[in-house]
């Protein structure tokens, strides 16, 4: 009886450990699937629009942006926008599907496509990218500077985890309505103190005549005491492919992205082998014990 209870306890501990180890991988895959569905729904809503609808949406967005002489940035981006926006003019622009999705961001080098939501409330940043209310909408144009924020290192989603791999000259793309805008990385500020409001506000301000987007996240990985700002400046989009990875790059990235899954599988196989060996060893001992008892009785 005691041996059965020990086996049951061992099994439960194994399942609990397996669940803890599997959670990041499973939850990240779920978020990836959810993001792909959001983007598909957005693209479907956009494709259902009529030409006059596009004109109306673009005009409303540009009119909203025209009220910004400069970006209104007050301190740190994260957690700065927790108010309910659903009755505001801001919520009404670029909300064609009615779910708060403005468009989506694609970064080929790190193989991500993420929906862009209105605002930077924490519930938004747990699952996707938030547009910082008070900065230019991600629609491009002269004298605009949009700020898009996302977390790094969340157990449930990768989001901007790999954004530190971007270098000057790398490309990212923003899809809004019927337009794709290409941005080339031209500035990276990798260790800005989150309390250095002056530097943050200066780095995120509109520059006269420029069309810029800054990707904003936490750094160092797992510490999050500073901010990483990756700025891109608009360049012509000529319909180029947004896939830059070679087959080898894709394989290496897959290994990197699924390292936890491989670790879990390795641990599972190792534990399975241990359990099988334990079972065979116990069975062998029982047979030996049985033979010894028989010999004792015969004697």
Residue ranges and their predicted role:
Residues 2, 6-7, 20-38, 117, ...:
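Extracytoplasmic/periplasmic soluble domains downstream of a signal peptide or transmembrane helix
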Residues 29-96:
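Juxtamembrane "stalk/linker" segments
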Residues 90-137:
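Extended boundary segments
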